[in-house]
């Protein structure tokens, strides 16, 4: 009996422990949403979706606006460049039309001048000292040749020899005092230098213009003993600057002995800053002048002026090998030209 009672108590204790550890209470059933609440939830989700779409559209519109602004700026810049190019082309066209008109005017003037020149006789125009001689200017001295717009020559001061061998000579070079250095550069020989009444070089540009028609060259020399000699050439031409003022000579005549200028025939002009000679050495620097150096000289009429006592000790003096050799520097030299058809 006691065993049954104890067994019942044990089972009761086990039940109580199990109940306390895992109580079982009655639960309420879940509350269902009303139709209004379901509708509100659906609207919120749609609103959020619309807000997202609006944000995306705003971003797209912003990007499109920026791109449109950039495209507009680019279009404006292109329009401005086109307008600038159009103005530039218009300016160029205007300048071209102006130059064309000016050229037509110049051609008209030149044609008129040419027509007037054809009707003139040689006595009407003054080209050089021979023209002055034909106009009865018979006194040797300084004259001014008027400018010639048709030939492009400016007014030119020259020294005319109206006495020697019939007169009419235009002097292009003189050495007599030694007061002017002839060791000059290309530009100075091109333009001319010195004193027209003393030592001078007329200028290669001027000499070129004066020798464009058939011209005779005369070279007169004097030594320190007072002896006089001359050399003449039936045909003298000086090329233009593009041709390096190349020298061309015809037949020689005179009493100076051997022709010492023919060695320089068909030779370009050289100066200390422009070496056009036919030698490895720079002859203009060796001979201290500007001249038609070949390789190097048989004459050096633009060399250093040495006075008596020093005149026979140097190779860079004013020399004419055919008379006194290579180391004798002359006392006086003149180079002069006149037309071949000149008649006193």
From Swiss-Prot:
The keyword Coiled coil applies. Keywords: Coiled coil, Disulfide bond, Glycoprotein, Secreted, Signal. GO terms for biological process: blood coagulation; negative regulation of vasculature development involved in avascular cornea development in camera-type eye; regulation of extracellular matrix organization. Pfam families: Fibrinogen_C. One of its GO terms (molecular function) is identical protein binding. Disulfide bonds join 129-160, 283-296. Residues 1-26 form the signal peptide. Glycans are attached at residues 56, 251, 265. Residues 37-116 form a coiled coil. InterPro entries: FIB_ANG-like, Fibrinogen-like_C, Fibrinogen_a/b/g_C_1, Fibrinogen_a/b/g_C_dom. It is found in: Secreted. SMART domains: FBG. Residues 120-341 form the Fibrinogen C-terminal domain. One of its GO terms (cellular component) is collagen-containing extracellular matrix. Homotetramer; disulfide-linked. Has a role in the formation and organization of the extracellular matrix. In the eye, it functions as a mediator of dexamethasone-induced matrix deposition in the trabecular meshwork, the tissue responsible for the outflow of the ocular aqueous humor and for the maintenance of intraocular pressure. Is a negative regulator of angiogenesis in the cornea, and plays a major role in maintaining corneal avascularity and transparency. This is Angiopoietin-related protein 7. The gene is ANGPTL7.
């Amino acid at each position: 009996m006691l065993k049954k009672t104890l067994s019942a108590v044990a089972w009761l204790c086990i039940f109580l422990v199990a109940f306390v550890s895992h109580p079982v209470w009655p639960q309420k059933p879940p509350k269902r949403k009303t139709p209004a609440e379901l509708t509100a939830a659906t609207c919120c989700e749609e609103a959020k979706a619309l807000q997202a779409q609006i944000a995306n559209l705003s971003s797209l519109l912003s990007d499109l606006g920026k791109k449109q602004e950039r495209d507009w700026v680019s279009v404006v810049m292109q329009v401005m460049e086109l307008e600038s190019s159009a103005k530039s082309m218009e300016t160029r066209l205007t300048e071209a039309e102006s130059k064309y008109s000016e050229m037509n005017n110049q051609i008209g003037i030149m044609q008129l001048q040419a027509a007037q020149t054809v009707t003139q006789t040689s006595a009407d125009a003054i080209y050089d000292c021979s023209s002055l001689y034909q106009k009865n200017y018979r006194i040797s001295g300084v004259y001014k040749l008027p400018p010639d717009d048709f030939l492009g020559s400016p007014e030119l001061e020259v020294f005319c020899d109206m006495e020697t061998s019939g007169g009419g000579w235009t002097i292009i070079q003189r050495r007599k005092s030694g007061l002017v250095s002839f060791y000059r550069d290309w530009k100075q020989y091109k333009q001319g230098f010195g004193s027209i009444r003393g030592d001078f070089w007329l200028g290669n540009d001027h000499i070129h213009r004066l020798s464009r028609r058939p011209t005779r060259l005369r070279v007169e020399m004097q030594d320190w003993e007072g002896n006089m000699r001359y050399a003449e050439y039936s045909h003298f031409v000086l090329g233009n600057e593009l041709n390096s003022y190349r020298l061309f000579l015809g037949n020689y005549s005179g009493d100076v002995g051997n022709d010492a200028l023919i060695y320089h025939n068909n030779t370009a002009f050289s100066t200390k800053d422009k070496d056009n000679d036919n030698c490895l050495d720079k002859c203009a620097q060796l001979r201290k002048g500007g001249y038609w150096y070949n390789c190097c000289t048989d004459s050096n009429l633009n060399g250093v002026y040495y006075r008596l006592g020093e005149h026979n000790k140097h190779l860079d003096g004013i020399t004419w090998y055919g008379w006194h050799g290579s180391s004798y520097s002359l006392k006086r030299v003149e180079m002069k030209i006149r037309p071949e058809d000149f008649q006193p």
